[in-house]
Structures are given as C-alpha cells and as structure tokens.
Regions:
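Transmembrane helix-loop-helix hairpins at the membrane interface
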Residues: 2-9, 36-116, 122, 227, ...
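Cytosolic catalytic regions of P-type ion-transporting ATPases
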Residues: 11, 80, 111-222, 426-429, ...
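Actuator/coupling domain of P-type ATPases
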Residues: 19-20, 30-42, 87-94, 98-109, ...
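Juxtamembrane coupling segments of multi-pass membrane pumps/enzymes
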Residues: 90-145, 151-152, 161-172, 275-299, ...
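Conserved beta-strand/loop elements of the cytosolic catalytic core of P-type E1-E2 ATPases, chiefly
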Residues: 91, 121, 193-196, 208, ...
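Membrane-embedded transport module
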Residues: 239, 243, 277, 347, ...
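Cytosolic catalytic regions of ATP/NTP-dependent phosphoryl-transfer enzymes
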Residues: 299-440, 446, 459-460, 468, ...
C-alpha cells in the first residue's frame, strides 16, 4: 500500500535500493530530489507570538479595563494600560520565542535515529537523513522512521499514535509499515518507500513531541487573583460609599475603582516565569539534561519521591563476571571458554558480552562452533555445537535449575548457589560434553556494579528532601543486596506490594514495566509528587502519569516522547540538577509573588483609608504608572540569584497571603507617615502630595522586592546585575519625570533623595518583620548550598 506516495518514488527508488541498500552518493542525490525525511512544523511568527500573549485570563482583565477607561475618556490611563499590555506581550513573546528556539534545538538532540544499510555496511543515521530506497532495520522499542516495505522478519506494530486504534497489528515480508508507528515486538529489515510529506501519515516531525502541559503557576496565579479581588471588592464598597458621602462625582470614582481592581492583576507573572524557566532550561541543556517544556522545570521543584530504575541509573548497566566455580579440567579459563561458545556477540546481549569479555581475558583459545541455538524464553537456555579436541561437543548455558534438568548437579553446588544468590548475583550454569554424555562444567556469577557516583548523588537527593525508591525487575535477593550497597533504608517490596506501595519501601523487586504505572498512581494517591525514570516502550504510561517523567540516556524513542525530562548521560546527576533548577525557579517566583501581594494590599488599603476622609492621595494615572514601573523591575527577578530549598517546594496561597499582608502592613505605616506629614505638617498642595506618595510607593515596592528575595537579612546576598540595573533605571527615569513635572506635579530633587533615604531606613527596620513573617508562616524551608544566579 503506497497511498500518498508519488509513483516515481516507489517505482524508481524502492526496487533499486533493495537489500543491497544505497551508497552515500545515491542517498545524497535522492535527498536533493525527495527532500529530508521530516514534516516542517510551522513556527508562529513574532506578530502571532505577541498576539497570543494578549489572549488569556490576565490579558482579558486588562483589556476590559482598557475599554472602560477609554469609554470614560481617561486617555492617559488607557494609553498606559495599552502600554502595559503591549510591553508584557512583547517581552513574553520574546522569551517564549527564545524558549521555543531552545526547545527546538533540544528536539534536534533528541532526534530519532535509524539503522540503515549504506555503503555495504550497517550504520546509524538521523531519521531525517533517510531517503526512499534505503534499507533499514527496526526492532522492539523503535519508532518507524519512514514508510517502508518489510523484506524479512516479523513485527508487531502499534499504530495508535497514527490511527487511534490501540490494537497492535502483525507485519511480515511484503507488508508496509508506516512512519510514526511503534514496534512492540520483533525485528525486521525493510526498504523505505516514502519519506517526509510523502509518507502515508506525514507525522515524522512529531515523533518526539514537545510537552505542552499547562504550568501549575497558571492555576496559582488565578487563585491569588481571586483572593486579592475579594479583598479589593470589599474595600471598593467602602471606597465608593465614603466618596459618595463626601459628595465626589461618580464619574471621578469609576477610574479609581478600575485601577484598584487592575492593581490585583499579576500582569508580569507569565513573563517572569518564562525568563526564570528559560534560564534554567538552558543551564540544564549545557549539563546534558533536556526538558521538553518549561513547566517541567517547575514540576521538578515539588518532587518528593523518585522511583529510579536500578539498571543504568543506580548501576552501571554493564554485566560483569565476578566469580566462577569450575569443575572443568582446564579450570576457570576452560569454563569461561565453553560458556562463551554458547554466547552470541551479534545480539549485543549484556550477559553474553560479559562472558565473552571474561573469556577473552583468560587467553584460552575459543572453540570452533558448527551450530548455535540462541537463548529462547521457552527453553531458557542457549546451545552450541563445538569442536573440542577433535570431538563434537554440545554446550548448554542457562539458569542452574534448567541445566540441572539436563545433567546431574554435583554435590557442594547448592551452598555456593545459595551464598552467591543471596548476595544478589545472577548465576548461570554450564553443561558440556559429547551428545548423550553431558557433564556439569561449572557456574558463572555475574553482577551489574553500582555506579561510582550513585551513593553521593543519593545523598544529595536526600539533602534536597527527595526519597529514592529503587525499581527493578530483578529477584528480591538481588534488589535487597543492591539497596544495602546503596544505603537505601526500608524493606524491599515485591510485585504484589505495588498496589499498596508507600514511601517506606526502599525498592520494589520483580516489577514489570507495566507495573510502574500502578506504582506511580499508588504513590500519588498518598499525596506524593512522584518522579519516575524509564527507558522502554512499556514505561511510557508511567512516564506520562508521573509529575516528573524522566527518560534515561538509553531510552527508546517512545519513552523520550512521553517524558518531561530526557537525560543524555547515565546516572542520577541529571535528576539532581533538574531538582535544583526547579527549586531556583520556585524561589524566584516566590519572590515575585510575595512582592506583588504585598504591594497590592499596601496600595489598596492606603487609597481606601484616606478616601474615607475625602483625601485622594494619588491619581489613577500615577497608580498605573507605578504598576508599569514595578513590573519593569520585578520581571528581572527571573534572572536573580536563588538559594536551593532543602525540601520539596509547594505553593500555599494562604501562607503567601499571610506573609504578603504582614509586609504590606509594615510598609503601610511608612506610607501613612508620609501622607500625614505631607498633608498636615508640611501642608503640600494635593498635586505635590500625590507625586510624593507615588514616588514613595514605587521606592517602597522596590525595597520590598529586595527584602523578600532573601530569606535571611536582605543584605545577605548580592542581587543579580540585571535586577540592580533595572532598579537603577527605574529610579532614574521616575526621578527625572518627577523633577520636570512630566505626567505629575513637579517636586524638588531634595524631596526625592529624602524619600529614598526614608525608604532605605524603613527597609532595614522592617526586615525584622519580614524574618518574623517567614518564620511563623513556615513558607520558607531550610536551604542547602549557596546562591546561584541566572
């Protein structure tokens, strides 16, 4: 079946390629003719990216306010609102564009590879380089890289990603396999018939999908807005009532009401998160950790339990012969040479390779082999016919119980088996001899050594408050031995314990890939934020179910497509780095959120308090200008230094509100003092007072930002250069506007300097209030390590 494939591509390309494959020259010629094997994804342009930032709950609030301001003919306010929208849209679009570009580069690094027969030899190449006529080899776990006609071998193909049908279909010689389908079982050679946009389903570009899950930050943002709007609504009622009592025209009140509500909208939050997450994503990529979406960085911050595959993550994924018990006349070397005769190097089986490597190190000559039967699940052994000193011998290699069924087990073997088995070794027995006279030759013990860096990295995860649970398909004795070696505490569960799993277990043995999904759900039901590592096709559901799905370095294409994080290096280091990056993003966003909550409460209470006595201490225009100025500075928090918390980070809106309100009340006293002194002691004109209050609110907002960014005294760490520069520019520009009376009544530079001094002194005094609020709320956990800047 060649639907959707140009006829010349089939009739000309496929037959000539045939089993012999193509040469590099032919492949280059066909690539220039048919194009690369990919479907280009249309990337949104800059304009479209900007417009996309103007659609959503936060932009809607501002857009409604803009329309209302315009309808009330408040032109300056409407222009500033429009400027807020456009500025945040452009900045968010710029950062999202950079993030898309970074993720596109990561997708190239995650590029699907294929085995292709070129220039007379099998070789690996990027799937996008395949051309019609290429001869490819696919096996279990692969994503089919192009439409192809099976030449030999049998496959079980999952086309659910293409057709939606979950039932696998069989494919054999003469049948077509389609690009984007998954090989569930078997292996086969096939001739490529179509590539790129000519494939039947045209899905090559989406073989590795970018995760597009919504960030939890969006939910948090809406919850915070709900709290603040509820507070605003109550205060607005007081404000309107008091204003009407003092005979203020309703037309003058309406703009104030709108601005009070706008003050609660976290306009710059999405842009700040994108900046913070993009910085960490790029840092992770430099260390070999690829994230498929920015939300993955945030999710890693809250992970408190990691289900880690034993093989390759905690161990070296390299079977090694560690001990032998030989009864062969030639000793250990003859035993290993006979065992090697029953191994097949072409399968790349790790056990076969370990025995072959051990045999080669002994220097014993290999035995000529006349026949070979590879390992089969039905017989649980492999066999070979060899020439042994001129005699035809049969050699069998398999589990001791299987070989014991073919030949008598010598006395004394059981003790050795029990001891090594209890230590977690994988043991194989070797039988050999003339047909009908097999003898027990000996035993070979193998183990997968623990990675050198595993204990230290497990210790680091423990410092970060992440408990590690080992998951393995090995037998319980092996799992217990490895858990002891790694220092993991707790019992080792078995497959039957998965349904009622808990964090008390140090690991689970005898687990099939299909059980991992149930394990993740069981732990999530107990309120755990779960990370799961995986590498196989059957790991995909568990990787998607886990909050933090991690595809390890050796993962199949399907596992990588299902994970939020993809490691390019073996071991746990990449996971540690992801957790640390997530914690830094959380700290930066916590700083932003606390500053926003505190500032909103301070502004609303200040305006409403004095409005009740008929004094409007600032104007709607100046409030909007203040929001604009504060957003400009607060977005640079995304680049700031951040300490790494010692425990999983979880958002608690009520505690955020509590800390924010505490800080707001402290700074509210400063604002009250400025208004009272200015209005009733110095007797400034109202316009001058409004400018002074505006400047005090802007300066105190910046001071509060520097306070909440540091969990200890605010002078404990140096802010990032971008934050200092943004603050300096903000103060300078607003100082110039105030001095020359642009958009506000002019004030003397002496007053501006005095306000800066007052705010600086208040920041030092109120830092004790901040420390008390953090301590009593419990919102901030202990930290580990130093600060890290973006």
């Amino acid at each position: 079946m060649t639907a959707g494939v140009p006829q010349d591509a089939v009739s000309d390309a496929a037959p000539r390629g045939g089993p012999r494959g193509l040469s590099t020259k032919e492949a280059v010629e066909r690539r220039s003719r048919f194009g690369t094997n990919e479907v280009h994804e249309a990337a949104p342009g800059t304009g479209r990216l900007v417009l996309s930032q103007l659609w959503g709950p936060v932009p809607w609030m501002l857009e409604v306010a803009l329309v209302l301001e315009a309808s009330l003919r408040q032109v300056p306010e409407a222009l500033i609102l429009g400027g807020l929208l456009v500025l945040n849209g452009i900045l968010s679009a710029h950062q999202e564009g950079r993030a898309r570009a970074a993720i596109a580069l990561l997708r190239q690094r995650l590029e699907v590879t294929a085995r292709v027969f070129r220039d007379g030899a099998w070789q690996s190449c990027a799937a996008r380089e395949i051309v019609p006529g290429d001869y490819i080899h696919v096996r279990m776990g692969d994503i089919v890289p192009a439409d192809a006609l099976v030449a030999n071998g049998t496959l079980e193909i999952d086309q659910s990603m293409l057709t939606g049908e979950s039932t696998s279909v069989g494919r054999g010689p003469g049948t077509t396999i389609y690009s984007g389908s998954i090989v569930r079982r078997g292996e086969a050679d096939a001739s490529v018939t179509a590539t790129g946009t000519s494939t039947y389903f045209g899905r090559t570009a989406e073989l590795v999908r970018t995760a597009r899950a919504e960030s939890h930050l969006q939910e948090l943002m809406l919850r915070v807005v709900q709290y603040l709007l509820a507070l605003d609504a109550a205060l607005v009622i007081v404000f309107v009532t008091a204003s009407l009592v003092h005979g203020v025209n309703l037309a003058l009140i309406a703009p104030f009401v709108l601005i009070l509500l706008i003050a609660s909208v976290p306009v710059a939050m999405p842009a700040t998160f994108t900046i913070a997450a993009s910085i960490e994503s790029r840092r992770l990529a430099d260390r070999g950790v690829l994230v498929t979406g920015l939300s993955a960085v945030e999710d890693a911050a809250g992970m408190d339990l990691l289900c880690a595959d034993k093989t390759g993550t905690l161990t070296q994924n390299r079977q090694t012969v560690t001990d032998v018990r030989s009864l062969a006349p030639g000793g250990d070397s003859e035993l290993l040479a006979l065992a090697a005769a029953a191994c097949d190097p072409s399968t790349q089986d790790p056990i076969d390779l370990a025995i072959l490597a051990a045999a080669s190190r002994t220097g014993h000559p290999s035995y000529p082999r006349s026949a070979f039967v590879p390992f089969e699940p039905a017989t649980k052994r492999s066999e070979a016919r060899i020439d042994h000193d001129g005699q035809s011998w049969r050699v069998v290699l398999g589990q001791p119980a299987i070989i014991a069924g073919l030949v008598a087990r010598p006395p004394g073997t059981d003790d050795w088996l029990e001891r090594r088995g209890g230590e977690g070794y994988r043991i194989l027995a070797v039988g050999a001899g003339p047909e009908g006279a097999l003898q027990w030759i000996g035993l070979v013990a193998l183990a997968d050594p623990i990675r050198d860096d595993a204990p230290a990295l497990l210790g680091r995860l423990a410092e970060l408050g992440v408990r590690v649970v080992m998951v393995t398909g090995d037998a319980p004795p092996t799992a217990r031995s490895v858990a002891r070696s790694l220092g993991l505490s707790g019992p080792v569960g078995e497959r039957g314990d998965v349904a009622h799993a808990s964090a008390e277990y140090s690991g689970f043995a005898g687990v099939y890939p299909e059980d991992k999904f149930d394990l993740v759900r069981s732990l999530q039901a107990q309120g755990r934020i779960v990370g799961m590592t995986g590498d196989g096709v059957n790991d995909a559901p568990a990787l998607k179910q886990a909050e933090v799905g991690v595809a390890v370095a050796s993962a199949t294409d399907v596992a990588k497509a299902s994970a939020k994080i993809v490691l390019t290096r073996p071991g746990l280091e990449g996971i540690v780095l992801a957790v640390e990056s997530g914690r830094r993003v959380y700290r930066r966003m916590l700083t932003w959120m606390l500053n926003k909550i505190s500032k909103t409460i301070q502004i609303v209470l200040l305006l409403v308090a004095f409005a009740t006595i008929g004094l409007f201490v600032t104007t709607p225009l100046l409030i909007l200008l203040m929001i604009f100025a504060n957003d400009f500075v607060s977005m640079s928090v995304g680049t700031d230094q951040a300490r790494i918390s010692a425990g999983p980070d979880q958002w608690d809106v009520r505690r955020l509100i509590m800390v924010g309100a505490s800080m707001a009340f402290g700074w509210l006293l400063v604002s009250f003092a400025v208004v009272i002194v200015g209005a009733y002691v110095i007797h400034w004109p109202l316009a001058t007072l409004q400018t002074v209050v505006f400047l005090e609110l802007v300066f105190s907002g910046q001071a509060m930002l520097y306070q909440v960014r540091e969990r200890g005294p605010f002078w404990s760490s140096r802010p990032a250069p971008a934050l200092l520069i943004a603050s300096g520019v903000d103060v300078l520009v607003l100082g110039i506007l105030a001095t020359f009376g642009i958009l506000m009544a002019p004030v003397s530079p002496i007053i501006i300097v005095a306000l800066l001094a007052i705010v600086a002194g208040a920041a030092v005094a109120l830092d004790r209030l901040k420390l008390w609020a953090f301590r009593t709320s419990g919102i901030v956990t202990a930290t580990v390590g130093g600060t890290t800047t973006g």
